[in-house]
Amino acid sequence: MIRALIVAGLVAGLGCAQEAPPVATFSVSGDLTSPLVLKADDLAKMPRQTVSVLEHDGSKVEYEGVLLWEILKRAGTPADKQLRGKAMASYLLAKAHDGYQVVFTLAEMSPEFGNETIILADKRGGQPLSGNQGPLKLVVPGDKAGARSVRMVEAIEFVKLLK
């Protein structure tokens, strides 16, 4: 009887186990010359940028992180004079821990075209992102709606539509 209660208690405890929180790693994969996996330490060593955004409630919040364009260039996405012709027919698929996905074009981030500031943030208001916001978040301050700001982001896949 005691053994049955112990086993029942252990099994019940397993039902309460929660999924482990996301780890602060970010990968850039796809048809690239130098696919990357960046950890929190790697991101901390890269040049930082701060952006201000309006939250849903109208409050202004600052996010800090690394310019996504710089990460993409390190991974070997077409940039500068390479971003022409067939390279323009490509996209970036951002993937979050919870399955959420968003598409970006490479040209919208390029300084030669859209020059849109998008950062891979690890801090909000000077504090590390946590809970359902982090540990990493793509922040798109120029968007009127926040649907392309991807919380719990883990990866970007570079996809060429024309080879």
Where are these regions (language model features)?
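Bacterial N-terminal signal peptides
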Residues: 3-13
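N-terminal intrinsically disordered, low-complexity segments enriched in P/E/S/T
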Residues: 16-163
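Serine/threonine-rich low-complexity intrinsically disordered regions
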Residues: 1-3, 31
